[in-house]
Curated annotation (Swiss-Prot):
Keyword vocabulary terms for this entry: Cytoplasm, GTP-binding, Hydrolase, Magnesium, Metal-binding, Nucleotide-binding
UniProt-listed SUPFAM superfamilies: Obg GTP-binding protein C-terminal domain, Obg GTP-binding protein N-terminal domain, P-loop containing nucleoside triphosphate hydrolases
Classification of source organism: Bacteria, Bacillati, Bacillota, Bacilli, Bacillales
This protein's name: GTPase Obg
Domain OBG-type G: start-end pairs: 159-329
Domain Obg stretches: 1-158
NCBIfam families linked to this entry: Obg_CgtA, Obg_CgtA_exten, PRK12296.1, PRK12297.1, PRK12299.1, small_GTP
Amino acid sequence: MFVDKVKVYAKGGDGGNGMVAYRREKYVPDGGPAGGDGGRGASVILEVDEGLRTLMDFRYNKHFKGKRGEHGMSKNMHGKKAEDLVVKVPPGTMVTDEETGALLADLTTHGQRAVVAKGGRGGRGNVRFVTPANPAPDHAENGEPGEERNLLLELKVLADVGLVGFPSVGKSTLLSIVSAAKPKIAEYHFTTITPNLGVVDTQDGRSFVMADLPGLIEGAHEGVGLGHQFLRHIERTRVIVHIVDMSAMEGRDPVEDYHKINEELSQYNYRLTERPQLVVANKMDMPEANENLKRFKEALGEETKIFPVSAITKDGVRELMLAIADELEHAPEFPLHDSEEQVEGRVLYKHELPIEPFTITRGDDGVFELSGAELERAFKMTDFAREESVRRFARRMRKMGVDEALRKRGAKDGDLVRIMKFEFEFVE
């Protein structure tokens, strides 16, 4: 098992702007307000798809932005809500906010969903601001900005495919040429003492996880060599790729090797024999390989399909990877037996962005700088092209206590105050 990690950016769509509009009707002031609300922006949602096994797709697409809601229209017509952006992830994906380190979601079951970036609500049209004192308001809200955050997706990956065979038959070499894994390769036995895993991406767009497992020897089911450690890992795979050395340079007979390995698998756990097994005749670039392959085929019979390859020259490797991907499409899942690998009662954590109180700082140029989630949200939703909207924003700041706080910090009439990239004069 290894942990696959990828960083992605998600932003919910902004809400549509509310509209300032009036209907043309006799005896109604200014025709009466008739501006509709904007539509809600699209949220970015992660959804579990049990057909996915890796985070490979996120290597090429790391930015996810929801669409904006439609703007409000005249005649009290509201803008259309944007359709949520649903992003598929494999089971077992954990989602963390990169900035805060907070766990946002732990996605485990097919169809489970988590909203990771909410779409902004639509701005209200001028019909929403009617009062007895102001029956025809010339004010509407801009749409609320959608949430945005950088996320860390983590997936604990179990191998789909296990490479088995005696030591030094070429398992590590094969894994190194079909994936980005860098296993230790040397001309002595048991170079691999822990599983190496790599993600294989086939030419037709399919992907799977392959494990180069420690070499198996006789007596492994009784714990000889790395037996128990090896067999615990092979128990988790869905397809077994049995690699046999056709060169016979180690002094072993390919036919005997094949039967000995299968005997160890059957002795350890009868369920290992239920897994689909692809037989690979490796080291076909060596002098004696063709003669040994002929004898090997005769011993196994026509019903056993054998894939001749050379991990060194890469001959036959592409066809082998496609055959493995085909086999995986029909191979069933096998449950894990180790309690340490099972996670019970996983919880979907709902993350709510806390409302920050505003803060006041002084910039290097001496300008008072205002920041804070609630204040910046109100600022972004204000249409500063309309005088009534500007006055409303000023009243809201006073209600929040911003004016009083600026005075306590020494602000005087005419001093500059900056919100985001915009500057205003402080007026007593």
